[in-house]
From Swiss-Prot:
It comes from Aedes aegypti (Yellowfever mosquito). Homodimer. This is Enhancer of rudimentary homolog. It holds the Pfam family ER. Belongs to the E(R) family. May have a role in the cell cycle. Keywords: Cell cycle. Coiled coil: none annotated. InterPro entries: EHR_sf (IPR035912), ERH (IPR000781).
Length: 103
């Protein structure tokens, strides 16, 4: 369980920057999925159930001006930065585990 800070900048304007903190990397990846789900709900307010494919989630991540994580490293007592590609890899692993497949 490594404390993780998610940095999000949806648009080009630096004023759109926000951050969230989580108790673990997996919790943070779930947070990224929730951000996308909220985005879908805003775009489709009359749709009772939101469904999406991982490629749609990754397209959303790619279109954000910036998305990165700072993950606490206990051994050095510092935070290490990670980019969108790393985040997508972690989301992929998380969703595979949730689906019950392990290859």
């Amino acid at each position: 369980m490594s404390h993780t800070i998610l940095l999000v900048q949806p648009g080009r304007n630096p004023e759109t920057r926000t951050y969230s903190d989580y108790e673990s990397v997996n919790e943070c990846m779930e947070g990224v999925c929730k951000i996308y789900e909220e985005h879908l709900k805003r775009r489709n307010p009359n749709t009772p159930t939101i469904t999406y494919d991982i490629s749609q989630l990754f397209d959303f991540v790619d279109q954000l001006a910036d998305l990165s994580c700072l993950v606490y490293q206990k051994s050095t007592n510092t935070y290490a930065p990670y980019n969108k590609e790393w985040i997508k890899e972690k989301i992929y692993v998380l969703l595979r585990q949730a689906a019950g497949t392990t290859d």
